[in-house]
């Protein structure tokens, strides 16, 4: 256990595919840690539960494979956690978003009706997903209470990752042109699912995987070698660049008035650094580890890491 500036770093070894998240059941005042261990070629997954001292408290077995990954991390909303269960490729591929209620241990599967779900977000009882098939990109909005589905589609470019902030859902779009791949950020009204505007981000084949927003700004990474984290003013829709000291910025997590940014190649699992960035001043401090860092979560002054040994 290693302590730096009151941040305690706890590592969890990835066995097959493991993703960590936090939840807070109603019957317990303390947060619990869930570790999803999933197999890609079998309909089999386990969720292991730990308390805040990393003592195992239980597990839940699921007959669904390929649940979540370092690319599509689960989202916790109070005592529920949402994730994409992709299923077994070419055998039992799924078109759903899964909800696990940690108070009842019941699972709900919301049928989106589109194959190859790429990314998702959840806000105010609505689930948003993206997918691309047969040259058409689709943004889907699914109401959890009524089952009503709305879709927005385009035949130019590929929709990627997305993030809900305020009254809008922001969707990454990549378009291949003669001068190369251009990344855009679409601003779409969450109620009507109509596109408000499209903002050019950069020329890069790297996609924006991770987002984070506060009341004023949207932050997103692009896994680039230019050591840049993007910041967009939510009122002005103006994008600026925050310079980092390491390549491959990925996951963005808030800590007090600063941001943790992981640095990792998500495909290879290689990357041993995390930045602590002050977005107001642009100053950052880099923490380097002896192991690779593939994913992390913060909770109550602790930084929890999952890693791959290569």
Q: How would you describe each model-predicted region?
A:
Residues 152-230:
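Solenoidal tandem-repeat scaffolds enriched in leucines and small polar residues
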Residues 37-38, 83, 129, 171, ...:
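Residue position within the beta-strands of beta-propeller blades
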Residues 1-13:
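N-terminal Sec-pathway targeting helices
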Residues 23-63:
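An edge-strand/N-cap motif at the start of beta-rich repeat modules
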Residues 67-76, 113-123, 156-166, 203-213, ...:
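Repeated scaffold domains used in trafficking and secretory/extracellular systems
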Residues 308-310:
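Conserved small/polar residues in nucleotide/adenosyl-binding loops
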Residues 57-65, 104-111, 147-154, 194-201, ...:
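A short beta-strand motif characteristic of beta-propeller blades
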Residues 43-48, 90-98, 135-140, 178-186, ...:
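Structural motif
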